[in-house]
């Protein structure tokens, strides 16, 4: 994996979309504390569980993580 999860997630931003991953990306962009340099699933998951009230369900993160892994393959 060469790019960080945050870098990947920013490619999914779309302010006009109602797609769950796009909304996650839009909100993560506004989250000043998001761990932008992380490539670690557990670190990101823990951060989101404790701090990301904007994420309606962790399934959205899981789906975004799988897309991230696929993009790095």
Swiss-Prot record:
Output the superkingdom of the source species: Bacteria
Q: Which Pfam families match?
A: YozE_SAM_like
Q: Which family is annotated?
A: Belongs to the UPF0346 family.
Query: Could you identify this protein by its name?
Result: UPF0346 protein lp_1865
């Amino acid at each position: 994996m060469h790019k960080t999860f945050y870098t990947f997630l920013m490619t999914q931003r779309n302010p006009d979309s109602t797609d769950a991953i796009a909304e996650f990306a839009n909100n993560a962009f506004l989250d000043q504390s998001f761990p932008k340099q992380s490539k670690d699933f557990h670190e990101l998951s823990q951060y989101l569980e404790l701090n990301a009230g904007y994420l309606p369900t962790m399934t959205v993160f899981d789906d975004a993580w799988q897309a991230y892994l696929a993009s790095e393959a």
